[in-house]
Amino acid sequence: MAAAVAAAGAGEPLSPEELVPKAEAEKAEEDLEEDDDDELDETLSERLWGLTEMFPERVRSAAGATFDLSLFVAQKMYRFSRAALWIGTTSFMILVLPVVFETEKLQMEQQQQLQQRQILLGPNTGLSGGMPGALPPLPGKI
């Protein structure tokens, strides 16, 4: 402490360690640790509820109304998306899938006819794309 008085008289600034004696600094740290333990007893919801008191009632009610509105809109959009997905899926299955199946069936039938022609008339008839029932092309003129 005498060093602090001598330094103050010389016009030099004092450091915080020089101002607070060692025993008091240790007590202050223990008090802070005890205060931290007291603060840990609060739950998160209690702390958040306590923070609402620093905002005016008008701001709190506006925030609550905004939250309620956003929740309502989210619920409506969820219900709409479910209904739209159901309508789209069933419409696709009723209107589009039969057409897809029929075109695939037609392609398979054409492929089978082409294979039968190749088996009956020879391997070059499938590639030439001649008229069905026509004579095969001459071997020298391809």
Curated annotation (Swiss-Prot):
GO molecular function annotation: mitochondrion targeting sequence binding; protein transmembrane transporter activity
Single GO biological process annotation from the record: positive regulation of apoptotic process
GO cellular component, one term: mitochondrial outer membrane translocase complex
Stretches the record annotates as Disordered: 1-40
Entry keywords, A to Z: Acetylation, Membrane, Mitochondrion, Mitochondrion outer membrane, Phosphoprotein, Protein transport, Receptor, Translocation, Transmembrane, Transmembrane helix, Transport
Biased composition (Low complexity): 1-11
Membrane topology note: Single-pass membrane protein
Mitochondrial intermembrane side, ranges: 104-142
Sequence positions bearing N-acetylalanine: A2
Coiled-coil intervals, chain numbering: none
Annotated spans, TMD: 83-103
Transmembrane parts of this sequence: 83-103
Positions carrying Phosphoserine: S15, S45
Complexes and interactors: Forms part of the preprotein translocase complex of the outer mitochondrial membrane (TOM complex) which consists of at least 7 different proteins (TOMM5, TOMM6, TOMM7, TOMM20, TOMM22, TOMM40 and TOMM70). Interacts with TOMM40. Interacts with PPP2R2B.
PANTHER family from the UniProt entry: MITOCHONDRIAL IMPORT RECEPTOR SUBUNIT TOM22, MITOCHONDRIAL IMPORT RECEPTOR SUBUNIT TOM22 HOMOLOG
Function as written in the Swiss-Prot or TrEMBL entry: Central receptor component of the translocase of the outer membrane of mitochondria (TOM complex) responsible for the recognition and translocation of cytosolically synthesized mitochondrial preproteins. Together with the peripheral receptor TOM20 functions as the transit peptide receptor and facilitates the movement of preproteins into the translocation pore. Required for the translocation across the mitochondrial outer membrane of cytochrome P450 monooxygenases.
The record's note on its domains: The N-terminal domain (residues 1-60) is important for binding to the unfolded mature imported proteins. Residues (47-69) of the cytoplasmic domain interacts with TOMM20 while the C-terminal segment (residues 61-80) binds presequence of preproteins. Requires the transmembrane domain (TMD), a short segment (the import sequence) in the cytoplasmic domain localizing separately from the TMD and the C-tail signal in the C-terminal domain for efficient targeting and integration into the TOM complex.
Family, similarity comment: Belongs to the Tom22 family.
Protein name (Swiss-Prot/TrEMBL): Mitochondrial import receptor subunit TOM22 homolog
Organism, scientific name: Rattus norvegicus (Rat)
